[in-house]
Amino acid sequence: MNLTKEYILSCYDKTKRLAKKSFEKGRYNRSLKYINIAARIAYQFNWIYRDDDLEELLANISKQTISKRNHYTPIENRYVLYVASMIDNRGEIQQYLRALIACEGELLVIVEKYGKEAAATIAEIKAYPKAKIYALQGDETDVESNAQKLYDKIVNFRPSKLFMHLRPESGFAITVFDALPEEIINYQINLTDHAFWLGCKCLDYIFEFRPYGCTVSQEKRKIDKDKILLLPYYPILNHRDFQGFPSSCTADKIILFSGGELYKIYGGNGLYFKIVKHILDENPQAILLYAGDGDTGGVNAFIAENKYENRFILLGFRQDINEVFKHCDIYLCTYPSAGGLMCQYAAVNGKPILAYNEPKARSKFIEDLICVNANVQLTFTDPKRLTEEAGRLITDKTYRKKQGKKQTKKGARK
């Protein structure tokens, strides 16, 4: 089935209507689920950045499910960090956690869910004597049963500041944050600056990690400029044992690596796949490995059509991501959505970066992430020049090493 824009918009509008109808019938859990579905649609297809209808519905659900305190006195240097999904080396959790620990205040970390994939982060929290961890129990979308519990947990802790690390569809958390006393200052940690998310109305300030996000939040999300704080982040270089590469990655092969959620390479008239095809067809010694989650259908179809079964290989999620970069030769940036953290890992490890974007999209160039204070150009605006550069990097080891060191020296943050 071909997903047309008209069909996507009709599904979105229908889901919003179902959310409103459920609310009017007092079925708040169901209303919240429809809100989250609508948010996921908007996030996946990325035609809007804010929806005040959904924001208003969340605020109304909050009023119906939470009894607010009449008086509240915050305690300074007491903070809450709310994490929707905790995974090591993903998002900006560890960066902000370390910053809050450095403030030497009391810290309550609230997590919707976590497992062994968050072992390093949990260890850091437990090692800090002033920190507590609270994991939500049951279904986090059960607003009727759990919203009041979470509200009471936060208010009883009496924080002065709340830091929100959310998913685009974190409707449950936002219903609680909407009800919090105004004495608590809410900071949104925006790890999804390129797409839609819920929560524009419940923040006091928003942390952006690059100028592009500042522009989107001001112009598209309609957030006041005075509330937007630019704070670049750095990759967390945890050591993990290398999990290895597929057997086809023999010593005579040049390993290109690419990574990020798979939606980042869909769209853009299929240009990412055209670039990959040109590189692999012109350079038989090259193999492309891709680490990331998402809908694999489009990638698998591309692999089968071009008989790339041993040359374009999906790795899934890799916790040893820094080791992956150490063992690859070249990093190929995603398109049409460029990944920030992956580019930083490449730069820190001295791997040359191949990045493309349209000339008119300079706000999305990766230079804003790894070369802020240096006059260096990494992003290509001509696909042909990029593939030519790829060929030279693949065939000339000395040049490849030189380019990797050059970008690290000129601007990559360590």
Could you describe each region identified by the protein language model?
Residues F157-L162, K326-G339, K351:
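Acidic donor-binding loop of glycosyltransferase active sites
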Residues M164-S170:
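Short His-centered aromatic/hydrophobic patch
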Residues D152, F317-D329, V348:
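Short acidic alpha-helix that forms the nucleotide-activated donor recognition element
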Residues T334-K401, K405-K406, K410:
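Catalytic binding pocket for nucleotide-activated donors in carbohydrate/polymer assembly enzymes
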Residues N2-A131:
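N-terminal subdomain of nucleotide-sugar transferases
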Residues I35-D51, F196-I228, A301:
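A short, active-site helix/loop in glycosyltransferases that binds the activated sugar's phosphate group
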Residues N89-L100, P211-E305, L314:
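Conserved catalytic-core segment of nucleotide-activated headgroup transferases in glycan assembly
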Residues E140-A147, D293-G297, F312-V324, A338-G339:
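Conserved active-site histidine-acidic residue motif and adjacent donor-binding/catalytic loop
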